[in-house]
Amino acid sequence: MASPSKAKEVFSSDEEGPAAGAEEHHKVKVSSLPFSVEALMSDKKPPKELPLAAAGGSADGATVGTSRNLLLPGHGSRDAHSPPGALTKTFDTASVKSENSEDGTSWIQEAGRYSPPPRHLSPTACTLRKHKTNRKPRTPFTTSQLLALERKFRQKQYLSIAERAEFSSSLNLTETQVKIWFQNRRAKAKRLQEAELEKLKMAAKPMLPSGFSLPFPINSPIQAASLYGTSYPFHRPVLPIPPVGLYATPVGYSMYHLS
């Protein structure tokens, strides 16, 4: 018969055995959880179950996976022990290399292939003025005839029939030739006069604003008073008029009419 101390040891060992087994089983379960500290440190992830909806597209996924493996050799699926950023770094470097080497050359080839053909610009045809078929040739005047015609034109721009007949006979010319020469000379004088007037306008343009001209002198007191209106019952003294270019309104309207 065993002593009481031995019985207590056996009893305690029997009680501690199941308790220790339960603790070990609990530790194993805790360590097997995917969000535990040990699982995160060891970076061991349990295989994820594919949903039922993705089962039909397994063939497409396989083809996409094979094509990716063919495009990027050596950059397969990330192992369980590889760092998280390894795949992204390799993919970035591979994409940069492909853009620099293949995409650049292909783009240049495409641009050279579809370049537009060079344009052959034809010179513009110069359109000449067509003269009449029955046009008379120009009269070749001599130097003495031209001097006599100019002297006569300065004296008188319009000749009578008798004067033209006498003058043409003295120069050995026809009346028609003298008549046409005087017509052309009057047109030339008119053009020269218009050019001189245009030069005078351009020279006097900085003195007055553009598009402005006064038909009367503005410094006259009577005409300056007429700007304020003489029909007003109480006449005001004449005020000094400011520069007209400061106002965009017409000169006939004043502040007293608008008030």
From Swiss-Prot:
Chain residue ranges for the region called Disordered: 1-29, 47-124
Main location: nucleus
Family: Belongs to the Msh homeobox family.
Biased composition, class Basic and acidic residues, residue ranges: 1-11
Coiled-coil ranges per UniProt: none
Function text: Acts as a transcriptional regulator in bone development. Binds to DNA. Morphogenetic role.
GO molecular function, one term: DNA-binding transcription factor activity, RNA polymerase II-specific
Any one annotated GO CC term: cytosol
Native organism: Gallus gallus (Chicken)
A Pfam family reported for this protein in Swiss-Prot or TrEMBL: Homeodomain
Record's keyword terms, sorted: Developmental protein, DNA-binding, Homeobox, Nucleus, Osteogenesis, Transcription, Transcription regulation
Skewed-composition ranges (Polar residues): 90-108
CDD domains referenced in this protein's UniProt entry, alphabetically: homeodomain (cd00086)
InterPro entries in alphabetical order: HD, HD_metazoa, Homeobox_CS, Homeodomain-like_sf, Msh_Homeobox_Regulators
Protein name (Swiss-Prot/TrEMBL): Homeobox protein MSX-2
DNA-binding region: 134-193
Compartment(s): Nucleus
One GO term (biological process): regulation of transcription by RNA polymerase II
